[in-house]
């Protein structure tokens, strides 16, 4: 049954009446015929989960786009629903690079999504750069002093302390 399309960070998945649906339906039927009833499952994820799945994957160096985030969000949801064993291996199909949809990441960091997306950023996913030294501080400090001051500020930002040996 065709569905109404709404704004989505996973635009490629938001197709109201995909031409490939009859083929997918046939493949699912064949999969269940071979594996038995209930071996094929579908989970639904929300926009918030999709964008945060992408950010989580990217934070760990996987360079995923929003569709990759959707895959990861679906995996998390499937595990929560008990559709997978805790240690079961999963392979995710993340087909595009994060740069393709970098605007969605920027909207998340800036909290500028239009209301239709129903996405509210969470602080723990906002990985925005922070200045260590202002431009004025940088130009007023000569080489070695700049390096020492930048190092000191980074230590403070990270909450590090001197370790006694």
Q: Where would I find each of the regions flagged by the language model?
A:
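Active-site/ligand-binding loops adjacent to catalytic centers
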Residues: 1-63, 108-165
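Claisen-condensing/thiolase-fold acyl-transfer catalytic domains that form or cleave C-C bonds
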Residues: 47-104
């Amino acid at each position: 049954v065709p569905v109404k399309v709404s704004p989505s960070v996973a635009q490629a998945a938001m197709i109201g009446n995909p031409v490939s649906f009859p083929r997918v339906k046939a493949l699912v039927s064949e999969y269940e015929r071979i594996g038995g009833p209930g071996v094929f499952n579908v989970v639904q994820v929300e926009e918030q989960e999709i964008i945060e799945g992408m950010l989580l994957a990217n934070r760990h160096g996987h360079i995923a786009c929003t569709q990759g985030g959707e895959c990861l969000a679906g995996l998390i949801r499937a595990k929560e629903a008990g559709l997978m064993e805790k240690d079961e291996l999963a392979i995710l199909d993340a087909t595009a690079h994060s740069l393709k949809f970098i605007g969605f990441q920027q909207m998340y960091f800036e909290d500028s999504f239009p209301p239709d997306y129903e996405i509210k950023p969470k602080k723990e996913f906002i990985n925005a750069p922070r200045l260590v030294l202002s431009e004025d501080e940088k130009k007023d400090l000569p080489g070695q002093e700049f390096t020492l001051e930048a190092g000191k500020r980074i230590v403070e930002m990270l909450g590090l302390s001197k370790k006694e040996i």
